[in-house]
Regions:
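N-terminal metal-binding scaffold of metallo-dependent hydrolase/deaminase domains
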Residues: 1-43, 55-57
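Divalent metal-coordination and catalytic microenvironments
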Residues: 7, 24, 29, 54, ...
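Active-site gating loops and adjacent loop-to-helix segments of metal-dependent hydrolytic enzymes
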Residues: 72-106, 163-164, 228-255, 275-278
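Alpha-helical scaffold segments that flank or form the walls of functional sites
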Residues: 76-128, 133-151, 173-186
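Metal-coordinating catalytic core of metallo-dependent amide/deamination hydrolases
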Residues: 129-262
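Active-site-adjacent C-terminal substructures of enzyme catalytic domains
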Residues: 251-302
Length: 302
């Protein structure tokens, strides 16, 4: 039995949202009592007590769109690198990084990200991974770090045709194999999704392969309209907007995550809402890559 108390408690309970001097009692993985510190200690006098010392006690955060592979690129300066737009940033930085990662480097990147997450109150991480220099086994390498540190995590590999169809197919199988592995895990700490980069690097052939091989019961995790080129390419090559294309491929739904959604219109927002698809807002990334601002509040209103 464990009691954490003497903290300002945010409960997420509408009837009692805040306690100035709150405590929470836990029996294993189950919260058994929430209340004023002295009252909780009276009920569980023999429990181990952790003094929050006036800090905040609240449910942990969930990071719904992470890129573990980028953790060691923070603050990286590349000689001669002078991007003129988002595509230059992708090819000159992020795709260059992911093409050179080894399994060991992927695992170390996961440790760095998960430790940073724990320090900042994040206990669940949805990671969208890419390491095109070493695809097979990369999700298991990340899983090892997550299990070692006790972080709940949902992993996927970023399927893309950008480095050729052979690597694209290998990426599909990395997702499929990890999803099956995660579905067989009964720890409630590991899950998998079918990861996709973005519409502009995924052909209809690859879309069809993902649809065919994705195990039942899981969704997709994909970047949508992060840059304007993604939208322009989809209109030119497929004659439709990105969310419409995803809908036509049965990718939308309550288990699917759409990252960014900067350049979406009213119709696409309605389609996202009608299919109960989830959107992840990434303001720090959008600023860092100078991609723009999504219609976040409009989506919230809908």
């Amino acid at each position: 039995m464990l009691v954490i108390g003497n903290g300002r408690m945010i409960t997420q309970d509408a009837s009692n949202p805040f306690l100035e001097n709150g405590a929470v009692a836990m029996d294993g993985n189950t919260i058994v009592m929430v209340g004023v510190t002295e009252e909780v200690k009276k009920v569980y006098p023999d429990a181990e007590f952790v003094d929050a010392k006036g800090g905040v006690i609240m449910p942990a955060f969930i990071n719904a769109h992470e890129h573990i592979y980028s953790s060691f690129a923070r603050g990286l300066s590349i000689n001669g690198y002078n991007p003129q737009g988002f595509l230059d940033i992708l090819d000159g930085l992020w795709w260059t990084v992911d093409r050179h990662l080894t399994l060991e480097q992927t695992k170390l990147s996961a440790y760095a990200t998960y430790i940073d997450s724990i320090k900042n109150g994040v206990t669940t991480v949805f990671d969208h991974h890419a390491s095109f220099g070493h695809i097979t086994g990369s999700l298991n390498a990340i899983e090892e770090a997550a299990k070692d540190l006790g972080v709940r995590t949902c992993l996927c590999y970023e399927i893309s045709d950008r480095d050729g169809m052979e690597k694209s197919r290998e990426s599909v199988m990395e997702n499929v194999n990890f999803i099956k592995h995660a579905l067989a895990d009964d720890s409630d700490m590991i899950a998998g999704m079918m990861g996709m980069h973005a519409s502009f690097t995924i052909s209809d052939e690859t879309m069809a392969l993902c649809n065919e091989l994705k195990p039942e019961g899981v969704g997709y995790h994909i970047h949508v309209a992060e840059g304007i080129y993604d939208l322009h390419q989809c209109l030119k090559e497929h004659g439709k907007r990105i969310v419409d294309r995803l809908h036509d491929w049965n990718i939308l739904g309550p288990k699917t995550l759409l990252g960014h959604c900067i350049y979406v219109n009213e119709h696409e927002m309605d389609l996202i809402k009608d299919t109960d698809t989830m959107v992840v807002h990434n303001p720090e990334s959008n600023m860092g890559n100078a991609c723009g601002c999504p219609p976040t509040m409009r989506m919230v209103q809908k």
